[in-house]
Regions:
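Transmembrane beta-barrel domains of Gram-negative outer membranes and organellar outer membranes
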Residues: 24-181
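Bacterial Sec-dependent N-terminal signal peptides
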Residues: 1-25
Length: 181
């Protein structure tokens, strides 16, 4: 029973942000209005805390038996590695990205920065100069943060993995790991 409760809690923590992700993905399309180069920089900065957290999470949880399997002996396991994201990753500074077409931005955040995907639901407006004449040609709303700390009560991500260990030859094991896209 205890395992079922823990598994349900972990699964809920993993799936809760996914329902919110659809809104954020639609908002991220707005970054394309800044042109390919700036859009790429803005998307990377916005998503960086989750990407970095998942990369740490996928590197954790490697486990093995102390003794190598016999030839074709195997074990199967599933793990959820929790990675906490520090509050310093709630915002990014668009001015530090070396943007080419974004001339300015405004933010409702008290610190004047743009929220990352894990950050609060602050609003950011970007101003774009597409033809280089120092005049604003367009503006667009950037995506708000999904406020992980408020929505799921923890600032972190879960990295689920499945692992299979197979004995192949003379005390040698092959480990195969699957991670969701």
């Amino acid at each position: 029973v205890r395992f079922a409760q823990i598994f349900t809690l972990l699964l809920t923590m993993y799936l809760a942000p996914l329902s919110l992700r659809a809104q954020s993905e639609n908002d991220m399309v707005n970054f394309l209005q800044a042109g390919p180069s700036d859009a790429s920089k803005l998307m990377n900065a916005y998503l960086n805390p989750v990407i970095e957290g998942l990369s740490y999470g996928f590197n954790g949880g490697w486990y093995t038996t102390a003794k190598a399997h016999k030839t074709l002996g195997f074990d199967i396991g599933v793990s959820f590695n929790a990675v906490f994201i520090p509050s310093s990753n709630n915002y990014f500074d668009p001015n530090s990205l070396g943007l080419e077409t974004i001339t300015d931005f405004t933010s409702t955040a008290a610190n004047g920065l743009a929220p990352t995907i894990v950050g609060p639901e602050d609003e950011t407006i970007y101003y774009v100069d597409l033809n280089g004449d120092n005049q604003t040609d367009a503006n667009f709303d950037g995506p708000q943060g999904l406020d992980f700390k408020e929505q799921i009560k923890i600032s972190g991500v879960l990295a689920p993995t499945a692992q299979i260990g197979i004995g192949i030859y003379k005390n040698t094991d092959l480990k195969i790991r699957w991670m969701p896209e």
